[in-house]
Amino acid sequence: ISSTLKADDWPGWFGPERDGVWREEGILDKFPQKGPKTIWKAPVGRGYAGPAVADGKVYIMDRQIDKGAKSPENPFSKITIPGNERLLCLDAKNGEIVWEKSYNCPYSISYSAGPRTTPLIDENRVYTIGAEGNLYCRSTSDGKEIWSTDFNTAFNVKTPTWGFSSTPLIYENLLICLAGGEGTVAVAFNKSNGKEVWRSLS
C-alpha cells in the first residue's frame, strides 16, 4: 500500500457499505512471494470475531477462560465454562492496547471458543454483542459503558445452540439487533441511549 494513502476505515462486519467490497485505491493486486511485511502483532484471546477499524483504532472481541477451566474436546458439548468476554481497543499504528473492557460471561454453548460478532463503530460509539447475548454500547475514547442490555433477561430468550452471532446494524438513529424469541426476533434500539423503539417477528 502506498505510504501516501490513508487506509479506509472498516467499521464493522463486511465494511462501511456492508457488502464486503474494499474500495480503497492503490492497494496491491497480489502479495509478494514471501507474503506481506508484518507491521505489528498483538496477542488476542479465543473467539471467532473479526476486527473493526476506525479512526486509527482496531477493535476486536475475545474470550478469556478462568484459570483451571478448559473447553471440551467435543465442540458440540454444552457444559458451562467460566470466563470473561473482552473488548480490546488497539492502536492501528503499533498494535498497543489503548484500553480494554471485560465482563463475566460463563458459556454454555457449542463451539465455546469465544465471541462471534464483529464490533460495530458509529461516530464515537462502539457496539458489541457477546455469544451469550450481552449487548454493550461503549465510548470509543476510553471504553466507558454508555448503555447495555442482556437479551436473555430483557426478552426472555435462551441463548441459541451456537450463541448469538449476528452483528448489529445501524439505520439512521436505530441500532437493529437479532435477539430471538417470541415477537422479538428483531429489536431496534435508540442507538444513543439504548431505549427500545420497536420489536418485530416471531
Identify the meaning behind each predicted range:
Residues 5-202:
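Noncatalytic, solvent-exposed loop/strand surfaces
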